Amino acid sequence: MFPPSSAPLLLPQLEELVVPLHTAFTLTCQGEATIAWDVPLDVPEKTQEDNSGLFVTTISVDSASAMHTGYYRCFYRRNATEDADEAMQSIYVYVPDPDVPFVPLVVPFGNHVLSDHEEMEIQCRVSDPSANVTLINVDTQQPVPCMYDSKRGALGVFTAGTYVCKGVVNGAEHYSEDYIVHGWIGGSGLHVELTAKHTVLLVGDTITVNCLAQGSEILEDHWKYPGKVANRAIKTVHENKKDQEILYTLTVPQASVKDTGIYSCSITDVVTNMSQTKQIAIRVYASEFMSIQPKFGEYESAELDEVCEFRAEITSFPTASVTWFKDSVPLSNVTAEISTSLQKLSETSYMSVLTLIRAKEEDSGNYTMRVKNGDQSRTVSLILEVKVPAVIVDLMDIHHGSATGQSVVCITRGQPTPLVEWFVCKNIKHCANDTSSWVPLPVNSTEVTMDSRFDEDNNLETQVIFGHLENTLAVRCLARNEMAAVSREIKLVSNGPHPELTVAAAVLVLLVIVIISLIVLVVIWKQKPRYEIRWRVIESVSPDGHEYIYVDPMQLPYDSRWEFPRDRLVLGRILGSGAFGKVVEGTAYGLSRSQPVMKVAVKMLKPTARSSEKQALMSELKIMTHLGPHLNIVNLLGACTKSGPIYIITEYCFYGDLVNYLHKNRESFLNPKPEKSNKKELDIFGINPADESSRSYVILSFESKGDYMDMKQADNTQYVPMLEISNASKYSDLQGSNYDHPPSQKGSNDGEMDQLLSDNMSEGLTTNDLLSFTYQVAKGMEFLASKNCVHRDLAARNVLLSQGKIVKICDFGLARDIMHDNNYVSKGSTFLPVKWMAPESIFDNLYTTLSDVWSYGILLWEIFSLGGTPYPGMIVDSSFYNKIKSGYRMSKPEHAPQDVYDMMMKCWNSEPEKRPSFLGLSDTIASLLPSSYKRHYERVNHEFLKSDHPAVTRVCVDNDDAYIGITYKNQGKLKDRESGFDEQRLSSDSGYIIPLPDLDPISDEEYGKRNRHSSQTSEESAIETGSSSSTFAKREGETLEDITLLDEMCLDCSDLVEDSFL
């Protein structure tokens, strides 16, 4: 057989071949010997020998892909080591794939290129020979000059960095994977460090092991660890080119006991073929553990000024916290000369050291080391005794010259407690030089008694009591312990009579007692609380509003239109009384055209009120006239300031204060009753729509009896005489008022309003009711803020509830016994509601609208805790103040939605400027209520301001038709007759009693007698007042027209007001 030629024959005989994607192609190589192939991807080959002796090898690809792109070479197997150019035949096959424009690399680290500053190859080969390829530097995003060969890639000299090839095929841009050119190959060797964040862990913790390698940039890492079979670890790589190091991190989440073992990291330098392995032990415990080995005994002693150390070894995981106590007080609060330290011996072992730098006597005591580890806590204790030499603090004669004997007290101290011995010397002249003259004192003889005790400073007081002394003698006190022995002497003079000293002492004692008594009386008088109105009008004196002054209420004008004839006011039962005054239920006649008889609340001072308190009440009246009317404040209706005590007449709120209401309805809130299917629909004020045309905007007087407010309740048997109205003319039978509103046209959402603002209190209490209360209070406070008025005592006890579930803000401090009210804390000569006050009010005496916002947040807490006391279980002391300063805030009440609690927390912001305004608060609450609530509220408020409510008419009317009482022009009287007022009669057998100034309440029994003899009482009262010309004593047959005429006659009498308070 002839020797084969130098190279076989490859068919087809082309340099390159383009094969469409997913089509088949075949290459054939024939020669005179056995043939081998070098192909980019393994493909099946078929070899056969024909009759002529030629070897024919065929490779076939059924579905071509981009991975088949590359050189296909055939050669004689025996010539594999010969020159490639002569021994091989080759063809380059392209398989264009639009989804794979660049041929993927199959060689490990094929995208890593070593920079040797010679021509390099970045093998970003394309699958489509028509592609236009540009090399881009990723770091600069700039093209890199190079020569590109579609069969080899980008050719050139490249600096270290990251590169990418951009190919454009048919107008579309494609990018290859990143190619990394390494500029450093590493030092002379390979260095590996293996560390772990924690080598001891608990089940569930995360194991983190770091393997830091320094060598070339082409390194391989290989890990061995207990959980490798389960492939539990996560590996990450971070390259630090600046320091020429690579960090490999192995992370095992949710470690278990099975992850305990050896963790091994092996690093191989691909360039130098060097490798290095490091190991570390990791231990995972199933649970926490802790043990203490004290290096001291239960009892220890130290000498004075000695440096002492007491050690205890602690084994714990996780890390334990160690605290030392002395006599149950943390050592950090005892002295700076006692130090504690904690030394870490290993990840689970520590040494705690207690050091007494210079032991002192007060360092004696019980020392306790408490070690806490999670839920585990253990303690070890030692009792330390610092030995102190015995000393005599004092030696004194207490009863020198007493006729009943003399007493000598020797005060000693030392550790251990000194032993005290007594000696006497009767020969005074030789006591100093002759030790034999001193003899021990017999214990508890007939002439001498001894006693000893420890005083508050833990000193030992030893007392010797001598009977009658005939001669002067010297007494020695000797104190000794194991550290020292000391003695002191004192001379006792024999007993003798000294009557002049006795008399002088008695006079001196009496004088001291008198002086002390006077001082106590003065202090008590100065500390007696004085009445002051909490509401204040402020005026800003700085551009930013941070500085302000209080406007003196006495400088505000008083409009005499508010004056109401005293004889038109009948006082009834006492609603509440306090340290300064009282609030009395009253009936006013002629306040309004639509309600000629109206139940009101009357504020007055006690008869013993000082002039400053009268001035304060007048200030309150002027502030209320300054504010004007609003739906959600207790409005001023009138005042009596002339010819008698000052009376402030306000709206009467039947359901009392909000706290009591929430308490009484707590059960209905917690256990709501099922709705009755046949319940009548009510409008938002609880008025039957069928009767709406005959009812006023809001009923201001009631015949039934209810609690009024949470204050010191007066004796129920005490009454101020009040007009009796017969059963035939009760309030419920009176005709409708003249400020009726037209019947409402109810929509589909009014059912929600029925429950929110219904007057049917049996319906129960809902979360929407609570939101309604908070919204109305916010609107009321928004109104006060618009008037520059600061409330300073905003709380649920100062919010009253009237018909239709309308809440009204008030200040009933006058009639509240604040000296015995736990909500008020004594500070100087006043009592403050500290738990409702903002920090700047408590600590800086700063009151603004923003401090009222803080109080509003406390009010929200009260409402949604259903009348709970703020900061439950906490007393107002230094600890309370410190907690407020440090940012303590109350947790969310049980019934508060999260949105409401978020609003509370905003109100309690320690920085006042960051608290919300009352306008913002009302908008926020409105968003939590049914959509139609705000519309209903605005309609009611509009009707209130358009009505002839007394609080509105006195502000709006400034013409001749204004009325005081019922003072109408003739056309007004005609109009009253036409509307049926002349049909309203008072009972013929009911007397009208003119109230005496500051008349003491009467008992129920006396009140009943007066009712039975009303006519007689009326006459007597009229005589006592001395005002027969203005007495409104209604006779049988009198009509309201007659009452009106009397009013007009008396109108001129009401122009004078006490000038001293105006």
From Swiss-Prot:
Residues 734-754, 975-1034 are annotated as: Disordered. Residues 526-1062 are cytoplasmic. The keyword Transferase applies. The chain crosses the membrane at residues 505-525. It is an enzyme of class 2 (transferase). Disulfide bonds join C29-C74, C124-C165, C211-C265, C410-C477. It catalyses: L-tyrosyl-[protein] + ATP = O-phospho-L-tyrosyl-[protein] + ADP + H(+). It is a single-pass type I membrane protein. One of its GO terms (biological process) is embryonic cranial skeleton morphogenesis. The active site is at D793. Residues 28-96, 91-184, 190-281, 287-381, 389-493 form the Ig-like C2-type domain. Interacts with homodimeric pdgfa, pdgfb and pdgfc, and with heterodimers formed by pdgfa and pdgfb. monomer in the absence of bound ligand. Interaction with dimeric pdgfa, pdgfb and/or pdgfc leads to receptor dimerization, where both pdgfra homodimers and heterodimers with pdgfrb are observed. Belongs to the protein kinase superfamily. Tyr protein kinase family. CSF-1/PDGF receptor subfamily. Tyrosine-protein kinase that acts as a cell-surface receptor for pdgfa, pdgfb and pdgfc and plays an essential role in the regulation of embryonic development, cell proliferation, survival and chemotaxis. Depending on the context, promotes or inhibits cell proliferation and cell migration. Plays an important role in the differentiation of bone marrow-derived mesenchymal stem cells. Required for normal skeleton development. Required for normal development of the gastrointestinal tract. Plays a role in cell migration and chemotaxis in wound healing. This is Platelet-derived growth factor receptor alpha. It comes from Takifugu rubripes. The gene is pdgfra.
